[in-house]
Amino acid sequence: VCEANQNGPTNQTVSGASLLENSGGSDVALLQLNSTPPSDYNVYYAGWDNSGAAPTSEVCIHHPSGDIKKISFNNDAAGEADWGSAATWHIPAWDDGTTEPGSSGSGLWNQDHRIIGQLFGGQASCSNNVNDYFGRFDVSWPLLESHLGSCGTTLDGWDPAGSTTYQYDALLQSINNVPPSLCNENTIDPTITIKNNGTETLTSLSIAWSATVG
């Protein structure tokens, strides 16, 4: 639906981010939010797949020029193609929905609900559902792994040899029972909730934390 019949919600917001990496090789940018969304927002952090395996079907979730959320579906396999300066996944035609000018940068999910790319460009619009090109996550991985591979989002941590491909959907849901400030206290008793949506059984994990003295 290109003509939105309602506005998106504005009661849940966060603002500010730092640019960690960017490259035209796959038209990728990695941003770190300046603040963590509150737990009562029920934010879902998507998993990702850096294997480079061709997807059998795809979904794009986007907010064209800040419009209310749109979802586009392709029921067929995406192909590999070069678009401009980027190595991309090519969507020949959307089966349900389309992208629009202003959808660039939106994520592409594979059949396992994992991010495999981000929208670079193409001819798709409200009047045309063909030819979209998404920069490939696996091509971006050498640029991203120093940030994603060692911070716990993959749980296996840093892999300097690049010998492992990751397909994990574990995410931090919430950290509770941590007071905003401590005075004359020697211990705290936080509660950390981890959700595993992946196919790998988690038997252990390491959590790194720090406190700011002020």
State the predicted function of each range:
Residues 4-6, 128-132:
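Surface-exposed intrinsically disordered loops and tails
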